[in-house]
Amino acid sequence: MYIGRFLVLGKTDEGNPFVTYRVSSRSFPNRVAKVMNDETVAILPKDLEEMFKNPYITYNCVKLVGDVAVATNGSHTDIIADKIKLGLPIRDALSYSLLTMDYEKDDYNTPRIAVVITKDEAYMGYVTDSDVRIKKVELEAGKAYYLSVYEACKITEHQVISVTGKTAEEVTKFVMDYEEFEKPVTAATVLVKDGFKLATI
């Protein structure tokens, strides 16, 4: 099944919260997730000239702000992180940013999706051309929600998968190799364990 870009939010078997963002693409397969510094992971085209073909293929997909991690499928990563840095509650930062940025104005009206986690809390959110939702979710060890731009842009108990892996690297590889979701390109994970651990593939 092709669901495009998606987020996976859950806990490892050891009970450590994580979020993984995976790029799946038919149109722009030549992208990489790159750790830019201790607080940021960016999605970049391998050929930098592709940046001028589509405004939505280059963005920060992960941003760390103190004890909060933000992961999204677009430039709203920075907006959400900035609002949290200014002191907005997570729910409000998500709501404001998704409503302000709205869905992507491309040929598909691609939704914007987002996850924000701390060691104690997890929120999911999305905005489409017909809906917007923010929800605080409870996480269970070994299980994870997924939220995608195509076919699975919902926050529901019906969109849950089992996840294996103890480290950020292992979780990233698991999500990257998850065969049910087609056209993997690159992925990045934030794992909460003695602070934040970042991994990309």
From Swiss-Prot:
Classification via SUPFAM superfamilies: Archaeal IMP cyclohydrolase PurO
Keyword Calcium belongs to the record: no
Keyword Hydrolase: yes
Key words, A-Z: Hydrolase, Purine biosynthesis
Enzyme class: hydrolase
Pfam short name (any one): IMP_cyclohyd
Swiss-Prot/TrEMBL GO biological process terms: 'de novo' IMP biosynthetic process
Catalytic activity annotation: IMP + H2O = 5-formamido-1-(5-phospho-D-ribosyl)imidazole-4-carboxamide
Pathway(s) of this molecule: Purine metabolism; IMP biosynthesis via de novo pathway; IMP from 5-formamido-1-(5-phospho-D-ribosyl)imidazole-4-carboxamide: step 1/1
Domain of life: Archaea
EC number(s) per entry: 3.5.4.10
One function term, GO molecular function aspect: IMP cyclohydrolase activity
Function as written in the Swiss-Prot or TrEMBL entry: Catalyzes the cyclization of 5-formylamidoimidazole-4-carboxamide ribonucleotide to IMP.
Family to which the UniProt record says this protein belongs: Belongs to the archaeal IMP cyclohydrolase family.
Name by which UniProt lists this protein: IMP cyclohydrolase
Organism listed in the record: Methanococcus maripaludis (strain DSM 14266 / JCM 13030 / NBRC 101832 / S2 / LL)
